[in-house]
Amino acid sequence: MKRRNDSECTAPLKKQKKRVAELALSLSSTSDDEPPSSVNHAAKASATSLSGSDSETEGKQRSSDSFDDAFKADSLVEGTSSRYSMYNSVSQKLMAKMGFKEGEGLGKYSQGRKDIVEASNQKGRRGLGLTLQGFDQELNVNWRDEPEPSACEQVSWFPECTTEIPDTQEMSDWMVVGKRKMIIEDETEFCGEGLLRSVLKCKSVFDVLDGEEMRRARTRANPYEMIRGVFFLNRAAMKMANMDFVFDRMFTNPRDSYGKPLVKDREAELLYFADVCAGPGGFSEYVLWRKRWHAKGFGLTLKGPHDFKLEDFYSASSELFEPYYGEGGIDGDGDITRPENINAFRNFVLDNTDHKGVHFLMADGGFSVEGQENLQEILSKQLLLCQFLMALSVVRTGGHFICKTFDLFTPFSVGLIYLLYCCFERVCLFKPITSRPANSERYVVCKGLKVGIDEVRDYLFSVNIKLNQLRNTDSDVNLVVPLEVIKGDHEFTDYMIRSNEGHCSLQIKALAKIRAFVQDTTLIEPRQAEIRKECLRLWGIPDQARVAPSSTDPKSKFFELIQGTEIDIFSYKPTPLTAKTLEKIRPVLDYRCMVSGSEQKFLIGLGKSQIYTWDGRQSDRWVKLDLKTELPRDTLLSVEIVHELKGEGKAQRKISAIHILDVLVLNGSDVREQHFNQRIQLAEKFVKAVSKPSRPDMNPIRVKEVYRLEEMEKIFVRLEMKIIKGSSGTPKLSYTGRDDRHFVPTGLYIVRTVNEPWTMGFSKSFKRKFFYNKKTKNSTFDLPADAIAPFHICYYGRLFWEWGDGIRVHESQKPQDPDKLSKEDVLSFIQTHSA
């Protein structure tokens, strides 16, 4: 051909022409109307006309200069719009050379595609070309005008209820039974129809979407997603932390109407709480992390895969929490809808809270409604009722309640909220920022249970029985409060509608946002890390990773807990109380005494059943305690292991118990510097927190009864001779404690609780005790800080009066040995020096 005879200077031009021709061919698109041959022909023709033809009919060859001039064209074609301005100049010029005109296709007959080739919409592992019907439809929701993410939240309460709490007579005809209803679309009494349909439509578009795609988009779209569970068991714990802060620590630091705390860490009363329908237990883990051993929890939840996972409480001591599964106790099934379980749990809680009830109850019940998400409210109605019923059953007067709810469109659900509104001082519906905005979850928060709610509780109990009777039938309880009663309270109704519609609007925007994030995987929420940091700071939660507690040996833990205290102190033995040392118990008012039942030991708790004892001698090791009991980690006590007895003769039962003489560290709290009386009071509180009344198989833990030395005679009243099994029928001296169990006493510990140079006296004119400083001669009725005898002073200065052979402390014992200290000698000395 002619071109092969051209000079070498035309070689670069050839290559350029070839590239242009290839580009034109690749940019031409096959048309559904033409066969491939015509398409190829058109492409070739187009390439020929744009890049210069080799055919001899053209008459002459385009020179390199004319090609370069054409290549410098300023635009695609005259009048091209700016919609192509994002393409660089080279590509625009190439398209111009191929004869591109806006609105027309390439090719001889303009048969090429007219639109720009779209980016791939392929998502995940779907098949090529799969289209999810409904998902790609326009929602016409502007999610971009959502409020700026913030850690600050506002609470809106229902107005205070001025209606009297309904009584049995008034509620006698409130329950309405009718046909079971399984649609939600027409529930427009407490929400606008348009909003209701919109939120249901938005939820429905996700039905066809792969779950993993949904989760990934939700994670990117939610500005609060990175908060997660921090170092807790799950996200539920952080929801509770969130709401506890928002409601001014209403749960972990409840206050009376004057703002005074109802429980204090230094005082004897525990913070009692209940956690129902709450496995695996995130709510409880948060409360116990916040309050430690100053709180005691009771739990009821379904047994099985959704049970409490106490072994996963890494940040709190699960020994302070006691699951109880209703009828059958620890062997029950935990089904809150069974009336017998409700009664059993109520009785158990009241029996173990001095018949007062808990300070607050948390309920977080829910179950999978996969495929029926829009009916979640209807399917969960009995669960919601039973959680409300449990609150009215176990919460004390003035106590609080928090419960997860879902949609609240039906008159049945709104009726339940109305009853809470009547029974509590204040009620609100609240969605914390830790609850994902796209779901229907929110919480009903109730403050201050009123007096006189028993009849409402009984009414809800009867409704639950009716629901159980109608199960698996076509009938259902459709109303618990008549619509005219609810709507007669205009302020309640207005709040309910505002709350529902506001919640719907939030959901609609959040769902539309997730949909947008599914469609565009490049979208992200840029402030997630910043918001997380701000929230944790505000709520008082350390930004730490979740790590399992490290295991350690008892000796290392002991040295960690005593923090450099001289170890020799722990090997001190008590001074024997004899006729020669009797003067040491002066002044009498400085001393307390306790009945001994065995050798004193130190006990350390490393968590659960990892408990060890040590006799105080450096040469001896810590020995694993062979008892079935549990203690929180970082606990150090001074104890005796005592064999307790109950009953006499063949029916007599023996059990080994831990008797606490003094406390050093309680679940990480060092109390050694506090007054002896305060330490004993905290020990009593600690024992209440760790006791497990539902577990009779466990060895009990008790605190020694402490007597004032001047009241020692009270001890002898509780001594009697009893026949001990295995003692050949010979009666033995026994001391009976507060719980009607008795043990064989070995003597009496006498502990000085006032530090030198202070001592105690009794003012006859004021008829009260006072403190006197022997050095400065000062006296005061208030306890001076330096008069408190810390643990090591009490331990070092204690005396022990041994009740061995020759010591007669009960009239039925053998005669007194005249060379030993007698009961009469001690009582006479005390009486003389306590006046």
Swiss-Prot record:
Residues of the active site: K239, D364, K404
Residues bearing the modification N6-acetyllysine: K108
Amino-acid positions noted as binding S-adenosyl-L-methionine in the UniProt annotation, renumbered to this chain: N234, C277, A278, G279, P280, G281, G282, F283, D335, I336
Domain G-patch: 87-133
Single Gene Ontology MF annotation: nucleic acid binding
Every RrmJ-type SAM-dependent 2'-O-MTase domain range: 231-450
Residues bearing PTM Phosphoserine: S28, S31, S53, S66, S91
Enzyme Commission no: 2.1.1.57
Main location: nucleus
Segments of skewed composition (Basic and acidic residues): 57-66
Sites where the protein binds substrate: K203, S204, V205, F206, D207, R218, N374, L375, Q376, N439
Gene Ontology biological process terms in this record: 7-methylguanosine mRNA capping; methylation; mRNA processing
Reactions performed catalytically: a 5'-end (N(7)-methyl 5'-triphosphoguanosine)-ribonucleoside in mRNA + S-adenosyl-L-methionine = a 5'-end (N(7)-methyl 5'-triphosphoguanosine)-(2'-O-methyl-ribonucleoside) in mRNA + S-adenosyl-L-homocysteine + H(+)
InterPro entries, per database record: G_patch_dom, mRNA_Cap_2O-Ribose_MeTrfase, RNA_MeTrfase_FtsJ_dom, RrmJ-type_MeTrfase, SAM-dependent_MTases_sf, WW_dom
Localization of this protein: Nucleus
PROSITE patterns named among the record's database cross-references: G_PATCH (PS50174), SAM_MT_RRMJ (PS51613), WW_DOMAIN_1 (PS01159), WW_DOMAIN_2 (PS50020)
Role noted for this protein: S-adenosyl-L-methionine-dependent methyltransferase that mediates mRNA cap1 2'-O-ribose methylation to the 5'-cap structure of mRNAs. Methylates the ribose of the first nucleotide of a m(7)GpppG-capped mRNA and small nuclear RNA (snRNA) to produce m(7)GpppRm (cap1). Displays a preference for cap0 transcripts. Cap1 modification is linked to higher levels of translation. May be involved in the interferon response pathway.
Subunit structure: Interacts with POLR2A (via C-terminus).
UniProt-recorded name of the protein: Cap-specific mRNA (nucleoside-2'-O-)-methyltransferase 1
Natural source organism: Bos taurus (Bovine)
Gene giving rise to this polypeptide: CMTR1
